[in-house]
Amino acid sequence: MKLFNSFSNKHYDIVHWYPRITVIDSKFAWNTDQHMDHEFYGDFGSFNVEITLPNHYVADGTGTLLNEQEVLPDTLRKKLDINNFIKKPYNSPPSVITKKDGTKKTWKFSAINVHDFAFTADPTYRIGETNWDGVRCIALVQEPHCAGWVNCSKYIAKVLEINSYNIGPYHHPKMIVADAQDGMEYPMLTLCGGFDPEYRSLLIHEMTHNWFQGMIGSNENYRAFMDEGFTQFYTADTYQYIDGPLMIEQKPKSNYVEKFTEPVRVLDDQIYNSFYANAVIRNEELPLNTHSDDFNGGIRHGGGYGQVYTKTAAMLKNLEYVLGRSFFDKAMQHYFKQWKFCHPYPEDFRNSIIGFTGVDLNWFFDQWLETTKTVDYKIGRIKHKKNDVYEITFKRKGSMQMPIDFVVIDKNDSARHYYIPNTWFEKPTGATTLPRWIGWGPKLKPTYTATLNIGTKIKNVIIDPSYRLADVDMTNNIKHGRINVRFDSHVYNPLNWKKYDVRIRPSVWYNGFDGAKFGAVMSGDYLLTKHVFEAGLWLSSGLGQAYLDSTVKINSFNKVSFFIDYKTSLNRYIKKSNVYLQLKSLDGLDAGTIGFEKRSNNNKTRVYTHLKAMLRDMPQDMVYLINDQEWGYRKLNSAIHVGLEHNYKYKRGVGTVLINLRSSAFTNDYDFSAATISSVNKNDLGKININTRLFGQIGFGNNLPSESMLYTAGANNEDLMDSKYNRSMGILPPNWGNYGNVTNHFTAGGGLNLRGFSGYLLAQKNADGSFNYNYKGATGAAFNTEIEFGELFKFMNPKFMKNSVKIQPYIFGDAGIINTNPAGTANVMSDLMVDAGVGTTLSIVRWGNLYNIKPLTIRFDVPFFINRLPYAENDYFQFRWMLGINKSF
């Protein structure tokens, strides 16, 4: 049962009856599988149901309403008609049609040849109805939403018409679509939500279940793809028949967003975008012929369960590609006619299709259902022979074989279509059929050369111009025009799986030495996976320089600065792995990184190794730093890192453990190594969040780079280089980052994170009268905690902010120790250092309609208490303040 409140009315969806009668079928006899939070498997039968409800409720459900005139007389039905409410403002409070008087009504239903019964009830339901071919098409809409559901009953009729034509006749007397804040299917009843036109794909999907889950009765507990995947295919197919090839969406309110929002193909939105996300981005492929409970250990829809929707839909689209549309339609209609009300299994489906077509399609079903093979074809060399004869070479890089449709575009933009069969079957086509290409995998006949007499020069060659072939790398399916270059508008558009996507935008930045910097940032990728890069180039103007010492030559700043980040997938060789590279000459720092990473199959664990090198080799390079005393001048800081990062979830919380081993390499300037471990946990306890961080490091070496040492109060200079706000002075005054005999005002999360000691040298007098300064070291441990309480006070985040700006106050406490001995000697640890206080963050988490812009967090901490007083302070408890950008951890 699902229950929710709407405008002080209780809404009921009574569904998923359990326990239920066990199904006996031809495969398993008595089917006794446990229910694992997926759909049920039920047998066909007849249901006679009586439901008694308070008098003011409006209800409907599976089957024929036997006493309609009793519970819904004509006078009441007219009052409930949706047309009476379509001019009401959307989401305005409902009226009262029937007053609650303490009496009850009994609704009587009879349903024949169904495997389940469900009903829905709500006092605010209003009714729209259309009739199609004797079938009642009923829309049950909550009155506040009527303005968004005006066309619902007519849309139901269209879906019934198209599905009955393409799949097979609908065998029940009615179809209900209910406004129920859901997306679920039951015989003759679908629970949906949203509004037109956004709800159209949802309505089609849930209604289409009535063919595959409803009338065919596939065992979704066993093989979910036979229902969800087939339904997903026809969701896209039916949508196109009704509304055309592009998704119908509401016009954006912003002219800027409208200008840069690209139209979306129905096939992409409903099938291919998600298919490529699974197959290429997340690399979560499993064979479709997998038990429904084997995805993510049977827990809901994770662990690649989405493949039963989109990989199956892509399989059927590729079966259409293999057979041709007309032949495919007839085969699917035969399957429905043969197996309706009969509980088929995967072998029944493939035998039905093969038997009807008379075509050996075992190679197709074996690849798509039983393996994780992928399609990947490439256009190779195009060789111009004499007399306008061309040789075009194709290469099969993937392990799945398919027939090939391709088009040749000549210099006059005329198109010539060709078809290369991959078996003895040849589909009906208007294209020129070439000799068949029979091969297997990437090694048995992996190349094919087509010899074509074009009669003129070739301009381009494109594999599958219909974009149906589920090729996992479309960038090599076209000879010219593989790259799509566009303005980086930061307006959301789905990923472009057809071409390599490049975005360019202007960029302006600032620091106190370069002044204003003007340049551009370019980024690009194929599905966020292959050849992912971001590069920036700026010219420094010197305009607005600030905080410069009189000894600094104001025009000695670096005139040009740049960075390049690059990463690409190595999935072809090692699953879920990447190689990455970074080069930069930015704000006085020349640095480079090259590394390798590998993620676990569930993406929770990442192991990595990389070599990182840094150098500041000019006097002016030191001017950029917030603290210019904490970096080795003209010293190469080069180190190898090996690490492991693990993310986990638990009840009411999430956590991350990071282990990093580091050792100097390829440098004579430093000798150091360190082992670091940190554990961060964020616990959501309702209106209070408790965040904790446990940190430890052991360091070794005789010559340690100051910029990479462990700092008591926060991040070291090396870590500051990862933030554009902190890598240079100017955004914040440089004197805030200096160390002295009092605390200071700059804070950045990292190190031991004892924020109350920011800027304090932590001097400790030795027996011989000398001093040690404990603000940095090589070995230490700390515990940090923050208790956030902003959700207790609604005024902290008022509605007008629309979740764009978030204010989060908290209480914090930090405790830690650090080594006090000189480098290369036995570790001697400091006394425990403690701070405590209050703080708040102001985070801009959404930038209006702009997409994919990182949040900005400004942090203000007031450590009222520290247990080691600076020389110039007298009270452990007093007002101190620190300002930083980004959270402490």
Regions found by a protein language model. Give the residues of each.
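Glycine/proline-rich low-complexity spacer/linker segments in large multi-domain proteins
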Residues: M1-F47, E68, Y467-N496
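Hydrophobic helix-coil surface modules that form long, contiguous segments used
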Residues: P19-A29, D37-I204, F233, P245
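Hydrophobic alpha-helical and helix-loop surface patches within well-folded domains
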Residues: F109, I138-Q401, V407-N412, R416, ...
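Outer-membrane beta-barrel initiation region
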Residues: S414, P446-N453, D464-R572, N627-K651, ...
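Outer-envelope beta-barrel architecture signal
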Residues: Y500-I504, A516-F518, T529-F533, N558-V560, ...
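Surface-exposed extracellular loop regions of Gram-negative outer-membrane beta-barrel proteins
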Residues: V521, V532-E534, S556, F562-D565, ...
